[in-house]
C-alpha cells in the first residue's frame, strides 16, 4: 500500500486542495489550511474533517501521506476483525484472516485506487471509513453501560463532520443498537445529530448542489440505479453475499440446527445506505459507496470464515486459489505502476520543468488515457489533463505551475486552434489536411473556438466554408510551445 500510494501521481483534486479554496494563493501553513477549510464549508462541501486533512497532507508532502495511508489501511483491516470478535464472542482471528480480508477488498471494491490510494478520495472515503470502524468498536464496548464516557460524545460529534455516507450509515446502525439493547443514550444521539446537521446543512453543500457544473452533470434517478447495477463489482458482491448467506443458513440453521450470529445489522444498514446515497447523489459515484460496500465484504468474510473454519479442505483450497489470484494480479499491477505509471509521470514532470525553464506559458502535454486504461477499472491510474483547457483539472494544474493554458493531446499530434469572430457560423466549416489525405485525430468546439489535434506530419491546412471570419490561428506543439500564431482571416496555411 505504501509503495502504490507513493508512486501514484497527483490527481486533479489534489491540485485543487493545494490552494486556499476560492483564492489564487497556495497553502503554506496551518492558518491557510483552516481558512481554506472554512471557504470550502461555505462554498463547496460540509466535509470539515476530510477537507482539513486533505489540505494538511498535501502540505506535508507525499511521503508522510503514504506512510499514514498505509497505516490507515492496516487499521481498517485490524479493527474490522476486532469488531467481528466483539459481535460473535466466539470467533477466533488468525493471521490468514488478514490476508483474506485484504484479498476480498483488492478484488471486490469497484474503485480500489480511488478509495484506498489517491490522496483526495482516500482521505474522504477510506480514512472516514477507518474513523467509523473505530467508532463502532468503541461503541460496542460501552453501549450497554449505564454511564458512558464523555469522550464518546466528542467522538460522536466528530463522526458527524466526516461525510454523507458515514452519517447515513452510523445513524441507521445506531437504530439497530437501540433496538438490540433496548436503551437510548440521548447524549450520543444528540452529539451525533449536531455534528451531522453541521455537515449536511453547510452552505457549501447547497452551493455545490445548485452550481452550474453540478446541474450539467445530474443524471436521473433511474439512470443512477441502472448504472449502479451495471457495475460488474456490484453484481459480484451481491451474488456472493446472497449465495453465502443462503449457504450459511442451510448449513447452520437448517442442517445442524445451530444458532449463529448473522451480521444482518451490517448488511441491512449497508443496503439502506446505498439506496439513500444513490437518491441524494447527483450522479453515480462508485468511490462514495466504499463504506456500505466494505461492510458487505466484511459480511462475506464472516460467512467464509465460519464455513472454512469447519472444513480444512475448503481452507486449503482457499489459500491455494487466493495465492494464485493475488500472484497473477500483482504480476499485472507491479509493472503497471512501477514501469508504466512511473514513466508517464516522469515524462510529464520533465515536460513541466522544460516549459517552466523556457518560460512557455501556453503548452501541450501528452494525453495518456489510452495507455492508463489498459489496467482494470478498479486498480488503474487516471489521466487528469484533457484537450479543453478550462476543465478544472487543467485549470488548477496551470495555476499550480504558473502556465496560462494547458492542453492534452494524443501522441504523434499537435494542437491546431482556430478562434472565430463573434457571430460566425461554424456549422459549414470544412478543414482539409494535406489536401484531404489526412484527418484530425479529435476535436473540441466551445463558443467561438475550435480545438483540433492534427498529425505531426501535416504540411498543409486549408479551411473552407462560408459565413465565418477567422480571428486567430495557433499551432502548439510538444516541447516547442506556440509554433504558429496568426491574427488574420487566412484560409490556407503551409507548414514546414
Give the location of each predicted region.
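Transmembrane alpha-helical segments
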Residues: 73-84, 129-143, 171-179, 242-250, ...
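Membrane-interface micro-motifs in multi-pass membrane enzymes
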Residues: 95-140, 163, 236-241, 273-303
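Transmembrane catalytic cores of multi-pass membrane glycosyltransferases
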Residues: 5-67, 119, 154-272, 279-288
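Membrane-interfacial loop-to-transmembrane alpha-helix junctions, especially the N-terminal start
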Residues: 90-100, 148-149, 184-190, 257-269, ...
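Hydrophobic membrane-spanning alpha-helices of multi-pass integral membrane proteins
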Residues: 264-274, 294-298, 320-327
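Signature aromatic-anchored transmembrane alpha helix within multi-pass, membrane-resident enzymes
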Residues: 149-151, 193, 306-331
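Intrinsically disordered, polar/acidic, low-complexity terminal segments
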Residues: 1-44, 58-76, 84-94, 322-496
Amino acid at each position: 500500500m505504501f509503495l502504490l500510494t507513493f508512486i501514484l501521481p497527483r490527481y486533479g483534486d489534489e491540485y485543487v486542495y493545494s490552494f486556499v479554496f476560492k483564492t489564487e494563493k497556495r497553502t503554506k501553513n496551518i492558518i491557510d489550511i483552516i481558512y481554506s477549510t472554512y471557504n470550502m464549508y461555505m462554498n463547496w462541501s460540509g466535509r470539515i474533517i476530510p477537507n482539513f486533512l486533505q489540505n494538511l497532507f498535501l502540505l506535508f508532502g507525499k511521503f508522510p501521506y503514504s506512510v499514514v495511508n498505509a497505516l490507515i489501511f492496516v487499521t481498517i483491516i485490524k479493527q474490522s476483525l476486532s469488531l467481528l470478535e466483539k459481535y460473535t464472542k466466539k470467533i477466533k482471528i488468525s493471521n490468514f484472516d488478514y490476508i483474506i480480508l485484504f484479498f476480498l477488498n483488492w478484488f471486490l471494491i469497484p474503485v480500489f485506487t480511488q478509495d484506498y490510494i489517491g490522496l483526495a478520495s482516500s482521505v474522504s472515503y477510506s480514512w472516514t471509513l477507518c474513523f467509523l470502524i473505530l467508532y463502532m468498536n468503541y461503541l460496542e464496548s460501552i453501549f450497554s453501560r449505564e454511564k458512558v464516557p464523555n469522550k464518546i460524545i466528542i467522538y460522536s460529534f466528530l463522526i458527524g463532520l466526516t461525510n454523507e455516507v458515514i452519517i447515513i450509515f452510523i445513524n441507521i446502525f445506531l437504530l439497530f443498537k437501540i433496538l438490540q439493547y433496548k436503551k437510548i443514550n440521548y447524549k450520543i444521539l444528540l452529539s451525533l445529530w449536531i455534528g451531522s446537521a453541521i455537515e449536511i446543512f453547510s452552505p457549501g453543500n447547497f452551493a455545490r448542489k445548485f452550481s452550474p457544473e453540478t446541474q450539467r452533470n445530474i443524471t436521473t434517478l433511474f439512470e443512477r440505479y441502472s448504472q449502479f447495477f451495471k457495475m460488474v463489482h456490484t453484481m459480484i458482491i451481491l451474488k456472493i453475499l446472497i449465495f453465502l448467506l443462503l449457504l450459511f443458513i442451510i448449513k447452520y440453521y437448517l442442517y445442524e440446527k445451530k444458532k449463529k450470529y448473522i451480521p444482518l445489522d451490517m448488511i441491512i444498514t449497508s443496503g439502506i445506505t446505498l439506496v439513500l446515497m444513490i437518491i441524494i447523489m447527483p450522479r453515480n459515484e462508485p468511490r462514495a459507496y466504499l463504506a456500505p460496500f466494505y461492510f458487505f465484504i466484511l459480511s462475506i468474510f464472516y460467512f467464509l470464515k465460519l464455513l472454512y473454519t469447519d472444513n480444512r479442505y475448503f481452507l486449503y483450497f482457499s489459500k491455494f486459489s487466493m495465492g494464485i489470484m493475488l500472484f497473477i494480479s500483482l504480476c499485472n499491477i507491479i509493472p503497471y505502476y512501477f514501469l508504466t505509471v512511473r514513466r508517464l509521470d516522469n515524462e510529464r514532470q520533465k515536460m513541466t520543468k522544460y516549459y517552466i525553464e523556457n518560460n512557455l506559458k501556453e503548452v501541450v502535454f501528452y494525453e495518456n488515457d489510452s495507455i492508463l486504461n489498459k489496467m482494470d477499472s478498479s486498480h488503474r491510474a487516471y489521466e487528469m489533463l484533457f484537450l479543453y483547457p478550462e476543465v478544472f483539472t487543467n485549470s488548477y494544474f496551470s495555476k499550480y505551475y504558473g502556465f496560462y493554458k494547458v492542453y492534452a493531446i494524443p501522441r504523434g499530434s499537435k494542437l491546431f486552434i482556430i478562434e472565430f469572430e463573434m457571430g460566425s457560423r461554424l456549422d459549414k466549416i470544412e478543414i482539409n489536411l494535406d489536401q484531404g489525405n489526412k484527418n484530425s485525430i479529435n476535436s473540441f468546439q466551445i463558443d467561438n473556438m475550435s480545438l483540433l489535434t492534427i498529425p505531426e506530419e501535416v504540411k498543409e491546412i486549408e479551411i473552407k466554408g462560408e459565413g465565418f471570419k477567422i480571428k486567430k490561428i495557433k499551432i502548439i506543439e510538444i516541447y516547442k510551445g506556440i509554433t504558429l500564431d496568426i491574427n488574420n482571416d487566412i484560409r490556407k496555411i503551409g507548414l514546414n
